[in-house]
């Protein structure tokens, strides 16, 4: 896991949160959530995992959580996630990254 690229990826997600409409909502199978609050919550969980040395799990969970509510990312942000994983990307995560890429 590359710490520098992980931090850059998290920064991009923080930027996405700041650029989001404060009234925007996201949905998953359990309900509807304010987009800004949702992103802040998953970022908080991510930071906590990173703090405890669980960087890989933190990035995997962050990707899964934002994908579950249909948030897509630009190719530069996806590239940062790939670089954070280094040469150790599972087929599942690779598929997730492809699904999350803005078309």
Where are these regions (language model features)?
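C-terminal-biased regions
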Residues: 1-103
């Amino acid at each position: 896991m590359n710490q520098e690229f992980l931090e850059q990826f998290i920064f991009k997600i923080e930027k996405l949160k700041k650029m989001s409409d404060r009234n925007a909502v996201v949905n998953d199978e359990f309900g509807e959530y304010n987009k800004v609050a949702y992103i802040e919550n998953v970022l908080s969980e991510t930071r906590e995992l990173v703090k405890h040395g669980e960087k890989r799990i933190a990035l995997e969970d962050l990707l899964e959580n934002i994908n579950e509510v249909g948030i897509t990312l630009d190719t530069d942000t996806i590239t940062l996630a790939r670089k954070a994983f280094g040469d150790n990307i599972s087929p599942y995560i690779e598929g997730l990254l492809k699904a999350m890429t803005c078309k």
